[in-house]
Amino acid sequence: MIKAYQASCQARVDAALEPLLQAPAEQLQRLYAAMRYSVMNGGKRVRPLLAYAACEAFGTPAEQANGAACAVELIHAYSLVHDDLPAMDDDDLRRGQPTTHKAFDEACAILAGDGLQSLAFTALLDPGLSPQADSIRLAMVQTLANAAGPAGMVGGQAIDLGSVGVKLDQQALEYMHRHKTGALIEASVRLGALASARADQAQLDALQVYARAVGLAFQVQDDILDVESDTATLGKRQGADIARDKPTYPALLGLDAAKAYAGELRDQALAALSGFGEHADPLRALARYIVERRH
């Protein structure tokens, strides 16, 4: 199920992203080329998948979440462009291709990331992509701004940069990853639910529990793959976190215990969906996929 669902959602979000990434003037061709390169060069599209699945959990057509799906993928892509810069993680490979600052240059990569961040909010406010009432679109903008900013993803990256060579306990490690990785994953689910225009507060609360567990599980599995996989499969440098002496779940818990923890988080996510019917099956499948994926 998950492969067909993933392919369908990837095609949908890519089609919605395409018009946003067209240069409006000849003078902006290189900037937009860097932006397109950063977004349209593959990727699992996990965050759009979660947005679409959360929308569908309420029986609402997935297309209602096109704006949400585009927005979270654009924010994710911008974060990768900036994370890969020499001043940050200094990576030269992403999704099996040279990172944006290697394919273009550092200044262009910085501007491309800035542009992608701005486009995310354009997508949420575009009535063609986000046909919801103004009050819902405002709530969606607030959700994404909170998740992407210093109280969310950006704050998590700041903590991450300050954690190199530092031995964090599990509570501190999870605080970092709930911000760096988890905040945008939680926002993806919430944005999809808001896009449905049918979610009540109790359902939003249940989905937050689901998304928080899935967000941590995603990071635990990433850390496991950094140990067990290879560069060709991952599309990025294998062992990079170990080489930089970054805190990881396998380093803290041991590999077997990290795998067990990922399974516990998956089960927590599935339990949070107990009040949802079969429309939430894609969310259930995604929770399983996130801890079973090999890249």
Residue ranges and their predicted role:
Residues 21, 25-271, 281-291:
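Mg2+-dependent prenyl diphosphate-binding active-site environment of isoprenoid biosynthetic enzymes
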